[in-house]
From Swiss-Prot:
Biased composition (Gly residues): 8-17
Protein name: mRNA export factor
Underlying gene: rae1
Role of this protein: Plays a role in mitotic bipolar spindle formation. Binds mRNA. May function in nucleocytoplasmic transport and in directly or indirectly attaching cytoplasmic mRNPs to the cytoskeleton.
Entries under PROSITE patterns matching the protein: WD_REPEATS_1 (PS00678), WD_REPEATS_2 (PS50082), WD_REPEATS_REGION (PS50294)
Any single GO BP term: cell division
Localization per Swiss-Prot or TrEMBL: Cytoplasm; Nucleus; Cytoplasm, Cytoskeleton, Spindle pole
InterPro entries: G-protein_beta_WD-40_rep (IPR020472), WD40/YVTN_repeat-like_dom_sf (IPR015943), WD40_repeat_CS (IPR019775), WD40_repeat_dom_sf (IPR036322), WD40_rpt (IPR001680)
Ranges for the WD repeats: 37-79, 84-114, 125-157, 168-206, 215-255, 271-301, 310-346
Species this protein is from: Xenopus tropicalis (Western clawed frog)
Length: 368
């Protein structure tokens, strides 16, 4: 019996196998292309939690839709289902049991998509587009956290039309992450707030941004005991900050590094500097991936402060990325991200989602 009630949600045809070949520069890494990708820019990707057998991938797009694929062991992708918003979808997440997907949109709503019944219902409302949505699973409660451009962070019981709690933000929410019992929200004007989620969500600390330019993406990382201990923050200026919440030596432990830059290295030959569009931590090794407007992905070891790999350059930006639950698959999307304005938008250009075998490339290198 299929997990979903609809065996063929959208599109036709099957995906290619691992080790497929590419003929042009839209796929220079020769990674697997996901079948029937969205028809407009892909804003977010999320793999299913380990509670589900197999691997399922969710993508949200500026075509107002959310799509789900089953990813088989051989790399083939099977379209399973699709839901719509009335505005672009900006974020997606899963419930911890894998039965529901939550979607956030420019239509100012968040929805809960029951994958077994393929029904979607509204569960959140803001006064402006909702930029982030996260599932919070605590010992004594579970809820949805939404961050909006209306400068608020709201927590919702999916059975109630009113929020459990509303927290005011200093500015518009640009990106967020949750790893219980910690949440981090980055806002416009370089605002940065850490929340604790035990018992009831509350503000823990406001942090002076380690970055000098607009925040673009954030991801929480864990320590060796599997507890959230800090976060990586990416900006539009081709830079990532690694920030620990309570480091033994803040001046030494917290640092930033440059990435997603090209060409020159000094004032006589200026660099091209690109936005960091996404950050994802490997669930096993704790290493991280960054993707950027330069059309490349890079893998990093933050503890050794080394780069593990940089991809060849795709012919358009990489807009989002995600690891599956055991870190064997790295998904990344190739879409225009509007970083160069409307004059660089080519409506004829296709959007792609690629799958890469990430089992080996994200391993920390052995210290000499």
């Amino acid at each position: 019996m299929s997990l979903f009630s609809t065996p063929g949600g959208f599109g036709t045809g099957g995906g290619s196998m691992f080790g497929s070949t590419a003929t042009d520069n839209h796929n220079p890494m020769k990674d697997i292309e996901v079948t029937s990708p969205p028809d407009d820019s892909i804003s977010c990707l999320s793999f299913s939690p380990p509670t589900l057998p197999g691997n399922f991938l969710i993508a949200g797009s500026w075509a107002n839709d959310v799509r789900c694929w089953e990813v088989q062991d051989n790399g083939q992708t099977i379209p399973k289902a699709q839901q719509m918003h009335t505005g672009p979808v900006l974020d997606v997440c899963w419930s911890d049991d894998g039965s529901k997907v939550f979607t956030a949109s420019c239509d100012k709503t968040a929805k809960m998509w029951d994958l077994n019944s393929n029904q979607s219902i509204q569960i959140a409302q803001h006064d402006a587009p909702i930029k982030t949505v996260h599932w919070v699973k605590a010992p004594n409660y579970s809820c949805i956290m939404t961050g909006s451009w209306d400068k608020s962070l709201k927590f919702w019981d999916t059975r109630s039309p009113n929020p459990l709690l509303t927290l005011q933000l200093p500015e518009r929410c640009y990106c967020a992450d949750v790893v219980y019992p910690m949440a981090v929200v980055a806002t416009a004007e370089r605002g940065l707030i850490v929340y604790q989620l035990e018992n009831q969500p509350s503000e823990f600390r406001r942090i002076d941004s380690p970055l000098k330019h607009q925040h673009r993406c954030v991801a929480i990382f864990k320590d060796k005991q599997n507890k959230p201990t800090g976060f990586a923050l990416g900006s539009i200026e081709g830079r990532v900050a690694i920030h620990y919440i309570n480091p033994p030596n803040p001046a030494k432990d917290n640092f930033t590094f440059k990435c997603h830059r090209s060409n020159g290295t000094n004032t006589t030959a200026p660099q091209d500097i690109y936005a960091v569009n996404g950050i994802a931590f490997h669930p096993v090794h704790g290493t991280l991936a960054t993707v950027g407007s330069d059309g490349r992905f890079s893998f990093w070891d933050k503890d050794a402060r080394t780069k593990l790999k940089t991809s060849e350059q795709l012919d358009q930006p990489i807009s989002a990325c995600s690891f599956n639950h055991n870190g064997n698959i790295f998904a990344y999307s190739s879409s225009y991200d509007w970083s160069k304005g409307h004059e660089f938008y080519n409506p004829q250009k296709k959007n792609y989602i690629f799958l890469r075998n990430a089992a080996e490339e994200l391993k920390p290198r052995n210290k000499k």
